Every structure is written in C-alpha cells, then in structure tokens.
C-alpha cells in the first residue's frame, strides 16, 4: 500500500471512544451501603477515642463534651483516609473511589480537605452559632406579635411569617430535599460532596446482567410527598394569617417557640425551673445539709447529683446519668415485656431499670429535709444524722455493696413509715 493511501486511512479512521475507559459512576444502593459502614466505624473510633480521653481528662470531661468528641472522631477518621487519598473502610467494602464531577480525574487535595471541613467540622460550628442566636434573641412584644396586623401589606405579612420559621426546620427541609434528589439521581449523598464535586465511581468493571435493577426512587418519591404535605400545611397557615384566623396564628407561634433542637434555656431559667419543680441539686449546700460532702457527687459525671436516684444495690447517681448509662449498657432484653436489665456502674450488679427509685427517693429526701428544717427538729439535727448513718451502716453490714450514707430501695418504705 502506498504511503499516501495509508495516511488517508489514518485520517478517516474513527477516533477511539475515550469514555469507554472511564470508571462507571456508583449507584445509590452502593453509596448507601458504604455510608452505613463508615458510620459504624466512626462510632467505633469515637468509643475508642472517648476511652483515651477519659484516661487523660477524666470521666467528667467525656460526659460534658460528647458532641466535641464525636466531631473529632469523624474528622480524624476522614483525615486518615480521604485526606490522604486512600479509601475509607466503607468505600473499601463496596470498592468505591472518589472522582470529579465529570469522572475524568481524582479530586485534588484542597477539594478533599474542604469536604472534610464542611462535612465534619462546619455543622458543629453552625449548630453552636444557631443556638447562640436563638438564646441571645430578645423576645418581642407578645401582644403585638401573636396577632398579625391585618392592615399590613401582603409582602410584610409574608416577611413576618418567614421570620418566625426556625433554623432547624429550614435545614431539615433542605437536607430532606437533597436526600430525595440523591435517591432519584444517585450522584451526591451529601451537600458538601456536591459543593466540592466529589462523586463516587466503582473501582471495578460492573456486570450489568448481574447487577440488580432496583433503586431508591420510591424512597425519594415518599420524601417529596412528605415535603409537599408539610408545605401545604405551612401554606394553609399563611393563608389563615391573611384571613384573620388568630387561633391558627397563635398555635403556629407556640409551635415555633417550642424549638427542641435550639431552645436551650439559660441558667436563670434553669434555676427558676428547679425551684418550681422542686428538683434536688446537691451542689447547693442548703439542700439536704445532713448528707456528707463526700457522698454528694455522682459516680458517673463526677459532679454534684441532680435528682439522686438509687439502684437496687443502693448506689446513687443522677437521674439523667443513670438513664443514659442504662441506654448504653443494656444487657438482657426482657422477652414480651417493656423492660430491660443493666448493670450498676460501681458494683456491676444486675438491676431492673423500671425499679430505679427516683420518685420514692426524691419524696423521702424532700420529707426528711422539711423535718430537718422544722423548729422542733433543729435541736436534734445532729442526732438525726447519727441515727440515719447508723441505720444505714447496719444495712451496709448486711449488703457490702451499699454505698453508705444513702438508703437502698429496701429501706425506703421503712423510713417513710418511721417519719
């Protein structure tokens, strides 16, 4: 063949399909499985990190900073894998790798670092910022705000209605809408990945004949339907404000004020609530002064007990601390019953959670406190403390696991009868 004809054949020959060499993008089920696996290992790393921090900083620090420890564990997990350009354990489980939006290259270092900051660290600061804004915002005049002025134009009414919406509801709506879009398209599981153009692709060749055809479009449709129903309810409330439905306006204002996520009360409100509800806080020396200082601290949070609660073994903790402990340390689930067992933190003895003596113990200590503060009982206050501790010392002789200056559940009825 002459050289001229060979050149002509090369010129008219079709160009190779470079797209055939690209990796195939991952589908939604594979991405969800990888995310679930990563969430599990992040939890394991958080527990290990919490144990290490507990050795150096103490148990009280781990109980007062659980959110910070979770953020640190998530950032550490992604920094050791994604930031260094390696796969996470979840990505290794289903063989996924990060590629750019068009699938032609691997995401750069700055994109990976920005994704880790936006995914693991930024939500923590946003949450703290929203909480601070919520707590620092001064309440407006309730009389003028409960009823929307009918003389205002529609634009100002809409602006007032939107101003009553909380940050948490807006963020939840955005997240639900984004996850619905992911279920339909299967492209970006997180908003941060969409912002930094980080998509998942399979690291191996996919056999489409063996790949199941099912996907998550149905879940996306259900989420969209839920958002539509919520939007209709909000639109109905907006129309009701224009038509003068004051009852609906007041209910909306009450619902907006009851923001569970960001409505953290101030210290003054907490103290006022404690006085109204009669909560026992042993940090106050004036409450139950006959209890020794060495016995006023909780063994879980290492701070003064709030609403002391006695287990069957007699050891006492804060009500919230022992409930959180029981939720994390459930041992044997009762079959056919709504109860479960747990072990005491101090003596590791088994007890039934429904038998925690918070109410009875609270009533007993309140009753004894009133008797100790009465005029006829002040003269024998020291004698009462001695008798109280002697009785409990006898009980401790019968039960070596009794903590000493607090009654066990077995003696609560006895003291109620005596006093």
Curated annotation (Swiss-Prot):
Membrane topology term: Multi-pass membrane protein
InterPro entries found in the cross-reference section: PEX2/10, Pex_N, Znf_RING, Znf_RING/FYVE/PHD, Znf_RING_CS
GO molecular-function terms, A-Z: transferase activity; zinc ion binding
Physiological role: E3 ubiquitin-protein ligase component of the peroxisomal translocation complex. The two types of peroxisomal matrix targeting signals, PTS1 and PTS2, are first recognized in the cytosol by their receptors PEX5 and PEX7, respectively, which then carry the cargo to the peroxisomal membrane. The peroxisomal targeting signal (PTS) receptor-cargo complexes interact with peroxisomal membrane protein (PMP) components of the docking complex.
Name the record gives this protein: Peroxisome biogenesis factor 10
UniProt keyword annotations, A-Z: Membrane, Metal-binding, Peroxisome, Peroxisome biogenesis, Protein transport, Transferase, Transmembrane, Transmembrane helix, Transport, Ubl conjugation pathway, Zinc, Zinc-finger
Null allele phenotype: Leads to a peroxisomal-deficient phenotype with the absence of peroxisomes and the accumulation of aberrant peroxisomal structures resembling 'membranous ghosts'.
Keyword Transferase part of the UniProt annotation: yes
Binding site for Zn(2+) 1: 298, 301, 318, 321
Superkingdom to which the source organism belongs: Eukaryota
EC number(s) recorded for this UniProt protein: 2.3.2.27
Membrane side Cytoplasmic: residue ranges: 58, 142-158, 236-419
Regulation of its activity: The E3 ubiquitin-protein ligase activity is stimulated by PEX12.
Subunit composition and interactions: Component of the peroxisomal translocation complex, composed of at least PEX3, PEX2, PEX10 and PEX12. Interacts with PEX19.
Domain comment quoted from the record: The three subunits of the retrotranslocation channel (PEX2, PEX10 and PEX12) coassemble in the membrane into a channel with an open 10 Angstrom pore. The RING-type zinc-fingers that catalyze PEX5 or PEX20 receptor ubiquitination are positioned above the pore on the cytosolic side of the complex.
Primary localization: membrane
GO CC field: peroxisomal membrane
Topological domains, Peroxisomal matrix: 1-27, 81-108, 186-215
SUPFAM superfamilies per UniProt: RING/U-box
Start and end residues, zinc fingers (RING-type): 298-360
Protein family membership: Belongs to the pex2/pex10/pex12 family.
Binding annotation for Zn(2+) 2: 313, 315, 334, 347
Transmembrane segments: 28-57, 59-80, 109-141, 159-185, 216-235
Name of the gene encoding the protein in the UniProt record: PEX10
